[in-house]
Amino acid sequence: MTRKNTTTNPWAKFHGPNLGYVIEQYDLYVTGAGSVDPELQELFEIFGAPSFQDDVVTGDNTATHFSPQNTGNIEKILKVVQLVEQIRSFGHTLAHINPMEDAANGQSLLERAMNELSDADLKAIPAKTVWQDAPEGIHTALDVIHRLKEVYTQSLAYEFSHIQDSEERAWLHQMVESNSLRQPLSNQKRTALLKRLTAVEGFEQFLHKTFVGQKRFSIEGVDMLVPVLDEIVLEGAKNGVEDVMIGMAHRGRLSVLAHVLEKPYSHMFAEFKHAKIEGAVANSGWTGDVKYHLGREQVVSNEEVSTRVTLANNPSHLEFVNPVVEGFARAAQENRKKSGLPEQDTSKSFVILVHGDAAFPGQGIVSETLNLSRLNAYQTGGTIHVIANNAVGFTTDSYDSRSTKYSSDLAKGFDIPIVHVNADDPEACLAAANLAIQYRMLFKKDFLIDLIGYRRYGHNEMDDPAVTQPQVYKKIKNHPTVRAIYADQLQAAGVLNADEIETITQFTQEQLKSDYAQVPPADTSDATIHVKVPDVVAKGIQSIDTGVELDSLRAINEGLLSWPEGFNVYPKVKKILERRKDALEENGKIEWALAESLAFASILQEGTPIRLTGQDSQRGTFAHRHIVLHDTDTNETYSPLHRLPNINASFSVHNSPLSEAAVVGYEYGYNVFAPETLVMWEAQYGDFSNTAQALFDQYVSAGRAKWGQKSGLVLLLPHGYEGQGPEHSSARPERFLQLAAENNWTVANLTSAAQYFHILRRQASILGTEAVRPLVLMTPKSLLRHPLTLSTASQLSEGRFQPALEQENLGTKPNKVKRLVLSTGKMAIDLAAEIESGKHEYNLDEIHIVRIEQLYPFPAEKVQSIIKRFKNLEEIIWVQEEPRNMGAWHYMAPILFELAGDKVKTGYIGRPDRSSPSGGDPFAHKAEQELIVSHALDVKYNFRQDKLEIEVFSN
């Protein structure tokens, strides 16, 4: 028998979904139709049925008495509770968020659920029973449903149910369900919004009529993108944000430049007209780029606040700008002027990424970049994403470009709140923008706005979109612009009259005409055809003394081999580190990893911050670096580079996610925005770097020539043929050499630890100067501890980087030398090892070997001076481990021909052309390598052909 207790009522604490659960359990308890939670069963026995008697005030202000005691009421309450949650979760399916489509037709699951309850049923249930935080004026469940439908099924639609954090989810629902998000705008702000839309539309239409047929990738159809960006930037500035970084593609970019970044109309028109105008500051390099790829930096302000806005330069490779801009933001957030890890303040900057509706689900770089958003090494405290959704990608409809309902669905997997908004409802768009910036500033996480509009013209202004989308373009042709729609709304609301609206339009037109009149005639001279590389770039990097005093190196080494008392270093690692103890003494030898650590420490002591990331970079792919130690008992980490004395710069080394493209883009962006920092990206194996090829092609190699965007990024690409197959042999140096021109970067393949030490220090010395450029290093694997790559302390304390090195003990009898062998990296060490082994007899008096340490720019003067010593030279040979169609041969061949002149032959020794970089059989590899070495050292071989083994030929 039920024991009722009338003194305490625990059921009053339950509301909404929790109430629904209790009612459902009580129904099972009464009917015996299923198992009941034991704790609830005990409460039912003590307190009886959930009693929520209340006076319900209906719409006609009459009070009715409601009690859920009977089973029928229990079922109705449960259905209402479920309906409330369904509206919150699936209201977006009924929302009118696409201006080119009618509102949902009522056939959805949600609509059917609504039809299961009559208005009378809903009027009988108190609002508080199903919505604990029901605002004032909401009395019944019918009021609740009407209110929630108004919130969730109009021109704003929300997807929050996938958010895992209950606090965030509750905050989001509270924000949209309360009146705080959709407070009526003041007449002043509504008028300003109309003026902004008039400027955007007027600018685009002026371009359309004035520069007929010229590509501009119009914003029309998603015009509200500009006011949305305005709102986010302004609200960010009010929150004290110092830098707002924007990444976007070409669609709408010119309007964003002109309005959000305040680029003068006259400067925009001059670019279309190909005219020179006074005051225009070139934000491009010596080759330049099309106008809708260029970026801009501008301090944007109003009467109260200001902030710096940076629109990143961007290629047409969609979405690849995303990680670059994230790198900008992290660099702006970090203080790198103290030892240890940099200090990050995510309130100093944030990112806005404008995506395309086809590119967001289509480009893998998007998900790679989203994956960075919560990682310690890459998070920037939240990015605001805006999909400029015009429902078509060039000529491809959405049903052919994605497998999901919405273009934004990818974001759900990363726990990102999503708001869909009709781009024809300006005030709803601003509400979405406000929610986005508030969420980002409060929770420090990403937020996405799906701005759904259309594309008024074709992909570019020369396309006829009706060819491929005839029906929708019939609609678009007759569809009013968002400016016209909003103007009518303001006129109907009495905010402005027709004359005032016309005055706004005329003012915009007069401003455009006036600015166009300032543009001089087109510059038809051909002077710009002759591109001139800046002298400081053309001269290359000057020779720099990069030695460090021996006492300083010894002190550094002592610090590198120290760790806090009680810190338990893994025994195997401890043994590796202890081997380095005497490396700088008289008979000591310095291996590659120690040379790197010594270089890092000395660079830090000179005030240059360092950031190194890559897969497994803390330990090193080949268990060589050990720059971060792990306590075997606590798993705490410690880096000696954080505790060395006399350091006034930060050091960070991070293991990256299993991504190349996003991480390379991020590190490039970080370095561009923090030019004083030595930023390094390390591939796990150089073979895998080609998944970031678009970043190498579009940014790292060409960014300065196109945009004047300087970078000193270092790429560490493990390279070397050791019989490990086609995925663990080649960093594809041929590709970096193919991109090499105009001294755009340095490409090197080194043969000693000292050379690595000096080139790192040289790179650090040019950071933040006009001489800066990226450094591409083919780094060793098997050579990391090879005896012939070890260096002495004096080789670090004295001298500088040498672009070319002569093999010791060769060429001592210049008149006898007939063959000059040029090689690089591991191939050069293999030749040296064969000579040192003494296994075979060679006439070494007739041969000399030069190691080309710096492949680009090629050290021509140095090599020429060597050649001049050998009066009887007959042949210059390039020897490489890669197949002939790969490696450096096709880059080196014309250089060799020029060096040799008319009397000296040139030749190649190496593997023949192959489609795969390496074979998979280690025994075959070894046999081939031995043949290459023996043929290179055997002067008598004299260029015989042996196609089955290796390829040897001359000119």
Swiss-Prot record:
Homodimer. Part of the 2-oxoglutarate dehydrogenase (OGDH) complex composed of E1 (2-oxoglutarate dehydrogenase), E2 (dihydrolipoamide succinyltransferase) and E3 (dihydrolipoamide dehydrogenase); the complex contains multiple copies of the three enzymatic components (E1, E2 and E3). It catalyses: N(6)-[(R)-lipoyl]-L-lysyl-[protein] + 2-oxoglutarate + H(+) = N(6)-[(R)-S(8)-succinyldihydrolipoyl]-L-lysyl-[protein] + CO2. One of its GO terms (cellular component) is cytosol. E1 component of the 2-oxoglutarate dehydrogenase (OGDH) complex which catalyzes the decarboxylation of 2-oxoglutarate, the first step in the conversion of 2-oxoglutarate to succinyl-CoA and CO(2). Its EC number is 1.2.4.2. Pfam families: E1_dh, OxoGdeHyase_C, Transket_pyr. PANTHER family: 2-OXOADIPATE DEHYDROGENASE COMPLEX COMPONENT E1, 2-OXOGLUTARATE DEHYDROGENASE. Coiled coil: none annotated. It comes from the Bacteria. Keywords: Glycolysis, Oxidoreductase, Thiamine pyrophosphate. This is 2-oxoglutarate dehydrogenase E1 component. Its cofactor is thiamine diphosphate.
